[in-house]
Amino acid sequence: MCTKTIPVLWGCFLLWNLYVSSSQTIYPGIKARITQRALDYGVQAGMKMIEQMLKEKKLPDLSGSESLEFLKVDYVNYNFSNIKISAFSFPNTSLAFVPGVGIKALTNHGTANISTDWGFESPLFQDTGGADLFLSGVYFTGIIILTRNDFGHPTLKLQDCYAQLSHAHVSFSGELSVLYNSFAEPMEKPILKNLNEMLCPIIASEVKALNANLSTLEVLTKIDNYTLLDYSLISSPEITENYLDLNLKGVFYPLENLTDPPFSPVPFVLPERSNSMLYIGIAEYFFKSASFAHFTAGVFNVTLSTEEISNHFVQNSQGLGNVLSRIAEIYILSQPFMVRIMATEPPIINLQPGNFTLDIPASIMMLTQPKNSTVETIVSMDFVASTSVGLVILGQRLVCSLSLNRFRLALPESNRSNIEVLRFENILSSILHFGVLPLANAKLQQGFPLSNPHKFLFVNSDIEVLEGFLLISTDLKYETSSKQQPSFHVWEGLNLISRQWRGKSAP
């Protein structure tokens, strides 16, 4: 009996483990894919970054002692200080993905020119001066391992580092340079040996410094006065032969409450493409969490006075006076009134191929306040406003705009043939279209920040709506100097996408 029970218990244990692990699976709200094209461009940009870094970087001092037998000198103590790389060339450099591991860097046939100060001391003499060091046959290979820390920051680790310099030539300058250059060759070998021993530790030190910078990245970004956006990594990068995927949490929180929304992200798969350097998939979950967080914060509640409505009806061909007179005709009003609109549920997000819609369930109240009296409700009813979401990439942000597709009061079908109901529905639709949506679009102008590498700009960007997620395809451009970012407070010249869902980034 006992022998039969043990396999059953083990089976139950394994099933329980599978259930627990599957129930704890976390899917990303944002998925970023780096392709081989990005790595190839990264080699070019990397050279610019290294050049900029080397202008400010001072290498460790190099010192030692050598005997010069041909001069009958027992020892010469030497010290090279203030070592700076003045020029370099790495013509054969490549980056490649190592599936499941990281990114392999390889360079060979490199050269470098180094300037340095030196000092010599021996039983016969001591002196100081300057020197130039030419290095050739530079070879380096190593693998950068990418993981994440407990706070969702990316971390880097150098593995299998191998670096070698094949040749070194020293040229001394100064009054006795002819003398020193005559015995420079015997010193080149120990210099080469010391440099070869220093290279991998120097590179590892730079990776460590880069990790320190990565650990300070803000994975929680304040979007507005109501919400935060979590950009943290939820898992280590997924690496294949052709690309690297970063899974980011991509969820909005109310400013005062970092609790996950009452719904979970669903998995989505980026299409197998390689024409762009970077692909960013933004899941429906990302937008749903933004909707929920703003709803929780009360952002979707608005009250408009007669004067405020007037300011937004200037584009209405019928004119505000005509609309207000129709309302007054129905309710026999002589005093100013207010319109209060409140979302009754978080707006509903729906992403289908070529179509991004936002349905807003809400209630609308017409209010008035006679002199020396409290606010009175004239009428209150529920409605659903269906809107299309227009998209554009402006700078490094995804900017949205809303346009009204349909406005429908929540009434029994039997009442829809009532002429007065239809008139009122049209009036409220006009108020929403010309009064409320312009206010919403003004707030949406600040956009959502898109995560991108430091000093890299998005260029040749394209937006596509697929089932369940938004796909951004873009190339990258490295900016050596910081330029002022475009303003997000002006809409003139923007080609906002309404029906054509594939678009280029704004110029």
Curated annotation (Swiss-Prot):
Compartment(s): Secreted
PROSITE patterns: LBP_BPI_CETP
Disulfide bond positions: C161-C200
One GO-annotated biological process of the protein: innate immune response
UniProt GO molecular function: lipopolysaccharide binding; phospholipid binding
Pfam families: LBP_BPI_CETP (PF01273), LBP_BPI_CETP_C (PF02886)
Residue positions with a glycan: N79, N92, N113, N213, N225, N257, N301, N355, N372, N415
Free-text tissue specificity from the UniProt record: Detected in the basal layer of the epidermis from inflammatory skin from psoriasis patients, but not in normal skin.
Keywords, comma-separated and alphabetical: Disulfide bond, Glycoprotein, Immunity, Innate immunity, Secreted, Signal
Residues of the signal peptide: 1-23
An example Gene Ontology CC term for this record: extracellular space
Similarity comment: family membership: Belongs to the BPI/LBP/Plunc superfamily. BPI/LBP family.
Name of the protein described by the UniProt record: BPI fold-containing family C protein
Gene name per UniProt: BPIFC
